From Swiss-Prot:
Species name: Mus musculus
Phosphothreonine sites (modified residues): T69, T235
GO molecular function: actin binding; protein phosphatase inhibitor activity
UniProt KW keywords: Actin-binding, Coiled coil, Nucleus, Phosphoprotein, Protein phosphatase inhibitor, Repeat
Name the UniProt record assigns to this protein: Phosphatase and actin regulator 3
Lineage: Eukaryota, Metazoa, Chordata, Craniata, Vertebrata
Gene giving rise to this polypeptide: Phactr3
Quaternary structure note: Binds PPP1CA and actin; thus inhibiting the protein phosphatase 1 (PP1) activity.
One GO cellular component, as annotated: nuclear matrix
Length: 558
């Protein structure tokens, strides 16, 4: 009997009834095992809630409860996998975009690209590989020990610490998105920031800072701890690690007090100095992507235009040089005012150098700053060119483009340098003037005199008497025509003037009182029928209609 029961237990996993007292102890044991590895707990589907009613010796009969189908529809253990896949997709897409803009090594220097090839155990860089060691994330074992030390004394043992470490790993994944979203800075900022190597991950700074402050005598096996380094301020944790902060010790909560809340916006955009560096970097606020792109475009455009401007200055006259300098200084002052309006609390010197270099590029400045609002619709260069050609730009844009063109119109000296306008000395100009004067004088001398024109009857001599005589003749001619005009009767006799009544026979109608009763309004039905009959007979007999147009004639119903 016992052997048969053992064989059946190997084949079918029998669930105990809830009335069995050993059921509670088994459930507590399984819960502790699940607490030790939360990943397995999340991935295993929930057990079917089907109470098994067992008889004395009969096998248990399954009864489907109401919650049996819930496991098929509601699967929360698959949500975390989907979230992780989405995070991986977004991080890979962002890293591809950033790698397309700049080189891989520059991105690693700026701390914007996290190494995808890193294994789960991230070790600190050895001093042979780089001149300055870079702080890396502690491995999973150290994270567990850190969180277990920082756990509250009254917290429930191992499950809470494992949850903290798991949430911190999630927060580091989420923070990788934040670091990848930071736009690439301008080339001027890269020159100053290239010498400093920022740390790769901000959550690792938080862990290292809290560890060094909570337990200073503890020695971790890292190359960073051996160097004499100033204590790093822990950066505020990202939003994804809100669950982890609830389980952290009271010491850590006291350390991240109101002072850290005040410093949060400054530290978010700050580049952390590597350990051992004597100076601290200046605090930079990350520029929005549109302004970064504008500064990059300006810097590229100034490189192309600097050579041409220098050549023009060398060849131009001293007066022209003074004009160019004055125009440049005025445009530089304008650009400084614009940059002061754009800048945040403290703008760095790199921005100023970039804007000073870009002042020579007038067209890009005008289009980027003054036409900023109107050019939002025309982000694409092809659309902008099409709108300029077709004339569909807004009026303000047209005016500003025209002003830019007029302002950047080449001078006479530049046209002469390009051989568009020929170079001439004063003597050559004088000779050309003399030739033109001679041509004009010849034409004037060849013009015929007044006597010659009178002889040809082109120009007539006029006196007052002759003019009056001509007027009299015209009047006599007109009066003669008017006198010889025939009368109406003569025209009627000649049948030249014909009235309408000459064509139509007029029937004299009796005058009647319009306000009196009209007799034809008092017609009976028989009278109307007789009138219709007479009209139809007249039409059929007297009026000849062509066969093709017979269908157009009206026939009054008798």
């Amino acid at each position: 009997m016992a052997a048969s029961e053992d064989g059946s237990s190997c084949l079918v996993s029998r669930g105990r009834s809830q009335s069995d007292p050993s059921f509670l102890s088994d459930s507590s044991a399984t819960s502790t095992d699940a607490g030790e590895n939360p990943d397995e707990m999340d991935q295993t589907p929930p057990a079917r809630s089907e109470p098994l009613v067992s008889g004395i010796r009969t096998p248990p009969v399954r009864r489907n409860s109401k919650l049996a189908t819930l496991g098929r529809i509601f699967k929360p253990w698959k949500w975390r996998k989907k979230k992780n896949e989405k995070l991986k997709q977004t991080t890979s897409a962002l890293e591809k975009k950033m790698a397309g803009r700049q080189g891989r090594e520059e991105l690693i220097k700026q701390g914007l690209l996290e190494m995808m090839e890193q294994d789960s155990e991230n070790k600190a860089c050895s001093p042979k590989e780089g001149s300055q060691p870079v702080q890396s994330e502690p491995p999973a074992g150290e994270q567990e020990t850190l969180t277990s030390e920082g756990a509250q004394p009254g917290s429930p043992s191992a499950s809470g610490t494992d949850q903290v470490s798991q949430d911190e790993l999630l927060s580091s994944d989420a923070h990788l998105d934040d670091t990848a979203n930071i736009p690439s800075a301008s080339t001027a900022e890269e020159a100053d920031a290239g010498s400093l190597l920022p740390t790769t991950d901000e959550p690792s700074q938080a862990l290292a800072g809290s560890d060094s402050l909570d337990s200073p005598p503890r020695s971790l096996e890292r190359s960073v701890s051996q160097l004499p380094s100033p204590p790093l301020l822990p950066t505020p944790p990202p939003k994804a690690s809100s669950k982890a902060t609830k389980n952290v010790t009271g010491q850590a909560a006291l350390f991240q007090g109101p002072s850290m809340k005040n410093n949060e916006p400054a530290l978010r955009g700050q580049l952390a100095t590597p350990t051992g560096s004597p100076h601290v970097t200046t605090v930079h606020r990350p520029l929005p992507p549109s302004r970064v792109m504008e500064e990059l475009h300006r810097a590229l455009a100034t490189k192309h235009r600097q050579d041409s401007f220098q050549g023009r200055e060398c060849r131009g006259s001293p007066k022209k040089r003074m004009d160019v300098r004055l125009s440049r200084t005025s445009s530089m002052e304008r650009g400084k005012e614009r940059d002061e309006a754009w800048s945040f609390d403290g703008a760095s010197e790199n921005k100023w150098t970039a804007t000073k270099d870009s002042e020579e590029n007038k067209e890009n400045l005008m289009l980027s700053s003054e036409l900023k609002d109107d050019m939002l619709l025309y982000q694409d260069e092809e659309a902008l060119n099409d709108s300029i050609i077709s004339g569909t730009l807004p009026r303000k844009c047209k005016k500003e483009l025209l002003a830019v063109k007029l302002r950047n119109r080449p001078s006479k000296q530049e046209l002469e340098d390009r051989n568009i306008f020929p170079r001439r000395t004063d003597e050559e100009r004088q000779e050309i003037r003399q030739q033109i004067e001679m041509k004009l004088s010849k034409r004037l001398s060849q013009r015929p005199a007044v006597e010659e024109l009178e002889r040809r009857n082109i120009l007539k001599q006029r006196n007052d008497q002759t003019e009056q005589e001509e007027r009299r003749e015209i009047k006599q001619r007109l009066t003669r025509k008017l006198n010889q005009r025939p009368t109406v009767d003569e025209l009627r006799d000649r049948k030249i003037l014909i009235r309408f009544s000459d064509y139509v026979e007029v029937a004299r109608a009796q005058d009647y009182d319009r306000r009196a009763d009209k007799p034809w309004t008092r017609l009976s039905a028989a009278d109307k029928a007789a009138i219709r009959k007479e009209l139809n007979e007249y039409k059929s007999n007297e009026m000849e209609v062509h066969a093709s147009s017979k269908h157009l004639t009206r026939f009054h119903r008798p």
